[in-house]
Amino acid sequence: VVPSLLEASPLPTIFTVRSAEEGGNFSGDDAHRTAMLHAALTSSKPPKYIDVEYELFVKQPWLIEDLPLGDCGIILSWHDMVGRPSDLFQKAAAMQDIPNISVVKMVWRARSLRDNLDAFKLLQARQQPMIALCMGPFGLMSRVLAPKFGGFATFATIDGHEATADGQPTTTELLSKYNFNSINARTKVYGVIGDTVEHSASPYFHNAAFAAAGTNSVYLPLPIPKGW
């Protein structure tokens, strides 16, 4: 099954066997997961990257050396489905110290807009390519502004399909609503603040106006619950 999936893709792929503990659907053991990674790497059309969870690497530090990588890169990933851990920056440093890693990926559930700022700090202090994103209703900012702070990639769901993580925008929202391909380090950020602003039409109007005027700016919904 794994080789046929890869061979059917017209585009470069990232192959991931995401555990249930980190938001995926894989419930097999580590040996099964390792076998699937091997199957992907030895297919006739191997992926451009494979995703290896940091917790799997901690249990099997020899894993990366044993994989037949060839030209395939490794994304070392970590996900916290509950919230921001207290050792976020220490974990980022530890992951970046591991040799032969192409990209470090860190994703956690945002408790408020404040967690997005930590994602941006991680990107600004990165020692190698990094993905730092926040999940949930407060995490959209980190996904849209990833290129502003030098993020390696962001993730979106195809229109009409289920998102692979809570809070993912659709590709149409990223490209058309937020003009994602125009965002860079010099992009100015504006937004509408309030409770339940997710359905505000303001981002549509303002971002369309920014694009028409050639203004390097983006307008975002910034949800702030009562009590903050």
What are the roles of these predicted feature ranges?
Residues 13, 74, 129-130, 217-219:
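Hydrophobic anchor at the start of a short beta-strand
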